[in-house]
Amino acid sequence: MGIKGLTALISDEAPGAIKEMEIKTYFGRKVAIDASMSLYQFLIAVRQNDGQQLMTESGETTSHLLGFFYRTLRMIDYGIKPMYVFDGTPPDLKKELLQKRFGRREEAREQEEEQKDVADAEKMDQLARRQVRPTRQHNEEVRHLLKLMGIPCVIAPSEAEAQCAELARAGKVYAAGSEDMDTLTFGTPILLKHLTASEQKKLPVHQVDLAKALEGLQMTMAQFIDLCILLGCDYLDPIKGIGPKTALKLIREHKTLENVVHHLKEDGKKSVQIPDHWPFQEARKIFESPDVQKGVDLDLKWEAPDVEAMVKFLCQDKGFSEDRVRKGCEKLQKSLSQKQQGRLDGFFTVKPGSAPPKRKAEDDKKNVKKKGKK
C-alpha cells in the first residue's frame, strides 16, 4: 500500500524533489530493488492476450519468471546493476493489514464464482487479479532464476523496502527501486519508481530525493515519519477526517504525533475519528529502527550467468522458448562482460519537468484558469 497521498503531497510542496528521468540516466548505477513488490506486480500484469496468467502445460504459473527475466535484462541492457531484496517476516503490526488483504482475496474469489455466468470479461479479469497472492514457490523460483543470471539477492529479516533503504544509506547501492513510497519513510536517500515497468508503457523513471522532499515539506526526518503515519501506512489506518493537506498542517504546527493526537482530542471535532487502538509509537519504531541486516556487512557480487542451467530451468522445466531465452542470455553475457565505463554525471540529459505528468497537467489547468481571470 505504501503511504497514502504522499507522492501528490511531495509534488505540491517539494516539486524539485521529484524528477522524471530516462532509464539510461542510471548507466553504471547499482540499485536495490524491492523484489516482493516486483513479484506481485508481475503476477498481476504479465498476462496472455486472453488475460490469463502465463502457465506451463501442467498449469504452473510462469508470469513472475518472465517478468523478472526480461525486466532484469532490460536494466542490464542500460548498464544498470540491479540486485533484489525479498521480504522476510512481517512486523506484528502488519498482520492486521495482511488479514484484510486475505479477506479481500476471498471476497473476490466468491464474487468470481457468483458472477462467472453473467459478468463480462473485463469484470472477471479484475476479480481474477484481485485474487493474486505470491507464494513461497514463486519466491523460491525467482531467487533460483536470479542466481542463475548471476544477480545478487538478499532476504531481508523483515520488510524488503527497509533493507533496500539500508543498502542505499550504506552506499552499497545508488538508490532503492520500489513503487512503495514508504521506502522513503525507511530513509532511502534516493527512491526510483517505475524502474521495472514494462518498456511498452514508456513510463519515465520517477526519481524522488529524500533530502529535497524534507526541505520542501519544511520538516525533519522524525516529523516526516510522523507525517507518513498520519497519512496512513502499512501498519496503521489513517485517522478518518484527516486528509493529506490537513495532516501536513497538523505536523507543521504541532511537530509530533503525540501533540497532534492531544490537539485532536481537545478539539473534539465529530468529523475526526481517532481509533480506540492506534499504536502510532509502534509504527514509528518500525520506521526509525527497522529490522535489517547492516548494509556494510553485506557483500554484493554480480557473477557470470549459468546459461545452460538457465535454459534447462526456463525452457525444459517451464516451457519458455529456447531461442528467445538463449538470445536473452547472449545479451546478458555481453552486457556483463563489457568493461564498466565510468559515469560522467550530466552526460545524459534529464527529461524536462520535475513533477509527475498528472501534477503538471493539474498545474496547467490552474494556469489557464488564472489567465482567464486577468
Curated annotation (Swiss-Prot):
What does this protein's record comment on cofactor binding?
Binds 2 magnesium ions per subunit. They probably participate in the reaction catalyzed by the enzyme. May bind an additional third magnesium ion after substrate binding.
What cofactors does the UniProt entry give for this protein?
A: Mg(2+)
Organism domain of life: Eukaryota
Q: Where does Mg(2+) 2 bind?
A: D180, D182, D234
GO biological process, alphabetically ordered:
base-excision repair; DNA replication, removal of RNA primer; double-strand break repair via nonhomologous end joining; gene conversion at mating-type locus; maintenance of DNA trinucleotide repeats
What InterPro entries is this protein classified in?
Answer: 5-3_exonuclease_C_sf, Flap_endonuc, HhH2, PIN-like_dom_sf, XPG-I_dom, XPG/Rad2, XPG_CS, XPG_DNA_repair_N
Instruction: Briefly state the modifications made to the protein after translation.
Output: Phosphorylated. Phosphorylation upon DNA damage induces relocalization to the nuclear plasma.
| Residues engaged in binding DNA | R47, R71, E159, G232, D234
Q: Which family does it belong to?
A: Belongs to the XPG/RAD2 endonuclease family. FEN1 subfamily.
PANTHER family named among the record's database cross-references: FLAP ENDONUCLEASE 1, FLAP ENDONUCLEASE FAMILY MEMBER
Q: What is this protein called?
A: Flap endonuclease 1
Lineage of the species this protein comes from: Eukaryota, Fungi, Dikarya, Basidiomycota, Ustilaginomycotina
